[in-house]
């Protein structure tokens, strides 16, 4: 592997990616670009080895499945600065570089007396990746707290600032996911309140707080409750390869929901993102089809959470993808519901 080192960036050839994705599957980048100084990005992208080539941005690789070697160049941001850039009477603006660990940012905000992100504690990944998927958990979505996304626009070759409306946030969606080849996120600014109405009505948070003896809960207590729940339900990707929840919870029109409930009375249904729709539990659908805890070779579904696809050791990305496709097909056959993957599939089509 040859290396080219420049001010603020480094280019490596034939770089292994196993440690750069949380499924821990083997893949190789023809070129790997590490950027420490975002202002050097235009110069780095103009390097003759990678100019004009396809570009894949990897944070910690916690929301991708490498089903093959990515074409072109893999880009990793290594800017890890976090600071409060503005104080207001009831909130503050926190700026974090794309390379900052997401959970570290949540803890930083809590240490500064700021709330809003506590339900998103312990989600693997980096700050730069969080707007792409509009990460969410336990009743919260990061898009509700994003003030500005700073990005390099590959179309205009300019650095731009996109406010929350420009980002077009939706359920596990954003303009960055819709146009993956256009924007390279270099930093995110968050609008975080000093006092925030806590979200306690999701997935056993109240029960966990009670077991902690935290009847008068604050944001830090909620974060600890979420951490406890996640550690019990979700495998540590450092120990067992996974990307968290592999499938989105399906959003369906109310009429389709009613028809399903007429046939499957015990099917849980949750409020949708908009009027006239409901949300199904993908985990429930998968478990009902018999996949929870199932294993074939080193590809499997966690015995603790039916949404979590796991690599027990040497499964390839292609094997994991085939396993996931068969899960989705069995759900479609039984319930006429189409499951969509949360992670971005690289090197193959879903």
Curated annotation (Swiss-Prot):
Cofactor(s) this protein cannot do without: FAD
Record keywords: Cell cycle, Cell division, Cell shape, Cell wall biogenesis/degradation, Cytoplasm, FAD, Flavoprotein, NADP, Oxidoreductase, Peptidoglycan synthesis
One of the Pfam families matching this protein, by short name: FAD_binding_4
Any one of the GO BP annotations: peptidoglycan biosynthetic process
Highest rank taxon of the organism: Bacteria
Listed pathway(s): Cell wall biogenesis; peptidoglycan biosynthesis
EC number in record: 1.3.1.98
Gene3D superfamilies from the UniProt entry: 3.30.465.10, UDP-N-acetylenolpyruvoylglucosamine reductase, C-terminal domain, Uridine Diphospho-n-acetylenolpyruvylglucosamine Reductase, domain 2
Gene Ontology cellular component list: cytosol
Record: active site: 172, 245 (proton donor), 342
Compartments where located: Cytoplasm
Primary enzyme class: oxidoreductase
Entries under SUPFAM superfamilies matching the protein: FAD-binding/transporter-associated domain-like, Uridine diphospho-N-Acetylenolpyruvylglucosamine reductase, MurB, C-terminal domain
Reactions performed catalytically: UDP-N-acetyl-alpha-D-muramate + NADP(+) = UDP-N-acetyl-3-O-(1-carboxyvinyl)-alpha-D-glucosamine + NADPH + H(+)
Positions of the FAD-binding PCMH-type domain: 24-195
Listed InterPro entries: FAD-bd_PCMH, FAD-bd_PCMH-like_sf, FAD-bd_PCMH_sub1, FAD-bd_PCMH_sub2, MurB, MurB_C, MurB_C_sf, Oxid_FAD_bind_N
Annotated GO MF terms: FAD binding; UDP-N-acetylmuramate dehydrogenase activity
Role, per record: Cell wall formation.
Family: Belongs to the MurB family.
Protein name: UDP-N-acetylenolpyruvoylglucosamine reductase
Organism: Xanthomonas axonopodis pv. citri (strain 306)
């Amino acid at each position: 592997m040859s290396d080219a080192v420049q001010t603020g960036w480094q280019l490596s050839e034939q770089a292994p990616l196993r440690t750069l994705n949380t499924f821990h599957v083997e893949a190789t980048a023809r070129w790997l670009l590490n950027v420490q100084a975002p202002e050097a990005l235009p110069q780095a992208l103009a390097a003759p080895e990678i100019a004009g080539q396809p570009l894949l941005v990897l944070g910690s690789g916690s929301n991708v499945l490498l089903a093959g070697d990515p074409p072109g160049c893999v880009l990793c941001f290594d800017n890890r600065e976090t600071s409060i850039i503005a104080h207001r009477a009831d909130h503050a603006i926190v700026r974090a570089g794309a390379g900052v660990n997401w959970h570290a940012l949540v803890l930083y905000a809590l240490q500064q007396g700021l709330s809003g992100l506590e339900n998103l504690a312990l989600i693997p990944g980096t700050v730069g990746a969080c707007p792409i998927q509009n990460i969410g958990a336990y009743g919260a979505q990061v898009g509700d707290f994003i003030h500005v996304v700073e990005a390099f626009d590959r179309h205009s070759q300019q650095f731009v600032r996109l406010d929350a409306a420009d980002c077009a946030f939706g359920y596990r969606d954003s303009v960055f996911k819709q146009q993956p080849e256009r924007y390279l996120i270099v930093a995110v600014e968050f609008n975080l309140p000093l006092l925030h109405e806590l979200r306690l009505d999701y997935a056993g948070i109240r029960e966990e707080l009670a077991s902690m003896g935290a009847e008068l809960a604050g944001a830090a207590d909620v974060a600890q409750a979420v951490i406890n729940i996640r550690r019990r339900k979700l495998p540590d990707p450092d120990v067992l390869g996974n990307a968290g929840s592999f499938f989105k919870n399906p959003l369906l029109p109310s009429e389709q929901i009613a028809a399903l409930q007429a046939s499957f009375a015990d099917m849980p249904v949750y409020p949708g993102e908009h009027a006239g729709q409901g949300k199904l539990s993908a985990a429930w659908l998968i478990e009902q089809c018999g996949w929870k805890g199932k294993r074939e070779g080193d590809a499997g579904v966690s015995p603790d959470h039916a949404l979590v696809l796991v690599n027990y050791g040497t499964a390839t990305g292609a094997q994991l993808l085939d396993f996931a496709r068969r899960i989705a097909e069995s759900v479609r056959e039984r319930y006429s519901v189409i499951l969509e993957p949360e992670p971005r599939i690289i090197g193959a089509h879903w």
